[in-house]
Amino acid sequence: MIFSILEHILTHISFSVVSIVLTIYFLTLLVNLDEIIGFFDSSDKGIIITFFGITGLLLTRWIYSGHFPLSNLYESLIFLSWAFSIIHMVSYFNKKQQNKLNTITAPSVIFIQGFATSGLLNKMPQSAILVPALQSQWLMMHVSMMILGYGALLCGSLLSIALLVITFRKVGPTFWKKNIKKNFLLNELFSFDVLYYINERNSILLQQNINFSFSRNYYRYQLIQQLDFWSFRIISLGFIFLTVGILSGAVWANETWGSYWNWDPKETWAFITWTIFAIYLHIKTNRNVRGINSAIVALIGFILIWICYFGVNLLGIGLHSYGSFTSN
């Protein structure tokens, strides 16, 4: 009873804090004022509070159930939001990249945790005895590595998606070109004295517009480079976790079912996801096809992760169907 109450309190604290954090963060994006910088810093600290709240929630379920809390979809989603909060804290202590990663991690934490605690999973939050297939020391190793891999790959893929949005975003037409055309017409209509004044004025305006356009394009270029930089490193880390998770799952499958690979639906989609991100990393080693091409591959990988993560759970088939929506 005590553990249930504590779990209920920690769930509401973590979800409430991250909701407030997301609200504050969106306000700072809509109202870019220096007076609310303190609120933005407080929102980052709120994610740290959320991290400890989710950590306490996982520990409470671990103690109460007697096993590592990764036996169903609800617990895996909570663990996934915990992984995103870790990435958020890394960006918090790295002040130079703070704003870039927080844009991805803060909404991800609240959406994932909100879905986990929603009515779709009303039967999942209750801890239950593990099925015989999950009563193994490989549970913590395999599932935790897979979820950490999913979290890192999703975060890195979202950064690549942001790169695509910024790259293909159409820049509004600059009005300094129109001024050049107007200058030509004015030169034909006015006297020399008036022309001298107009040319001087328009040359100043032209220089200001060029500087503005250059600074804006330079900032976009720097932002794209930083997104590409961090996307590659986070996806590389997630790829390592995913590889370890697949290998540990193969060893576990051999001990449980007598075969390293059974072409189970989730195994198949995990292998496809692994292949896509292997292609992404291969593209990043080729300087001639970096940037947009690798970001498109990451976008495909982002879709495949959700298919792999929820596909089997929605269908309720295969060896991994014990955590599905229909299993309860």
Swiss-Prot record:
GO biological process: cytochrome complex assembly
Keywords: Chloroplast, Cytochrome c-type biogenesis, Membrane, Plastid, Thylakoid, Transmembrane, Transmembrane helix
Matching InterPro entries: Cyt_c_assembly, Cyt_c_biogenesis_CcsA, Cyt_c_biogenesis_CcsA/CcmC
One Pfam family named in its UniProt record: Cytochrom_C_asm
CC per GO annotation: chloroplast thylakoid membrane
Transmembrane segment boundaries: 13-33, 46-66, 73-93, 101-121, 146-166, 234-254, 263-283, 295-315
Keyword Membrane: yes
GO molecular function: heme binding
Cell compartment(s), UniProt: Plastid, Chloroplast thylakoid membrane
Membrane topology type: Multi-pass membrane protein
Family: Belongs to the CcmF/CycK/Ccl1/NrfE/CcsA family.
Function of the protein: Required during biogenesis of c-type cytochromes (cytochrome c6 and cytochrome f) at the step of heme attachment.
Oligomer and partners: May interact with Ccs1.
Name under which the protein is recorded: Cytochrome c biogenesis protein CcsA
Gene (UniProt): ccsA
